[in-house]
């Protein structure tokens, strides 16, 4: 049975006003236990206001990057998400369980086109998939349809645009916004 390990937070950054990305330091002694595949998640644990609180968050990094990152969007009234976004700091520690879950497809040697329809924070496991499949499958193509409320609420927008440039012609992105008029990054508005 998997157990929790204490991991130090290497960095915590804001992606949007209500979404933080936690980057964990990974000791060499734990790197094998924390090996992951695209689409998996980490279960985090902290004592918050005297209560043992646990939540699972999709990994948004890729093993190609040799990083362990999760994004946590603040939910109104959310105990753990508020703790991460308002209290947690670089250098703090969290209890973390090794990766689990099977949301995704294995790496292929054949030419494939992947298509993902994502809304808001649902981008987190898909970002890991985009990075991994495009890096490990030279003939792969990826089409991302990404729905958000506003431009400022687009999680990982800068990173996604960097990936589009890095994998020019292999990564297509279609943004859709529900609370703003059509703008240059968006071809149409969803009502």
Each language-model region and where it sits:
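Ferredoxin-reductase
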Residues: 2-92, 148-150, 178
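FNR/FR-type flavoprotein reductase catalytic core
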Residues: 82-191
């Amino acid at each position: 049975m998997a157990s929790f390990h204490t991991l130090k937070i290497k960095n915590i950054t804001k992606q949007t006003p209500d979404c933080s990305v936690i980057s964990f330091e990974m000791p060499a002694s734990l790197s094998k236990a924390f090996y992951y595949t695209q689409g998996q998640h980490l279960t985090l644990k902290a004592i918050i206001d005297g209560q043992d609180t646990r939540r699972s968050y999709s990994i948004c990094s890729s093993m190609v990057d040799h990083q362990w990152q999760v994004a946590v969007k603040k939910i109104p009234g959310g105990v753990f998400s508020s703790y991460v976004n308002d209290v947690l700091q670089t250098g703090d520690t969290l209890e973390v369980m090794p990766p689990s879950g099977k949301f995704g497809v294995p790496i292929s040697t054949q030419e494939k086109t992947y298509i993902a329809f994502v809304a808001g924070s649902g981008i987190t496991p898909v970002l890991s998939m985009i990075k991994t499949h495009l890096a490990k499958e030279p003939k792969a193509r990826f089409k991302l349809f990404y729905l958000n409320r506003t431009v400022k609420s687009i999680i990982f927008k800068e990173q996604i645009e960097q990936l589009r440039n890095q994998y020019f012609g292999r990564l297509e992105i279609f943004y859709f916004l529900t609370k703003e008029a059509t703008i240059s990054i968006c071809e149409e508005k969803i009502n």
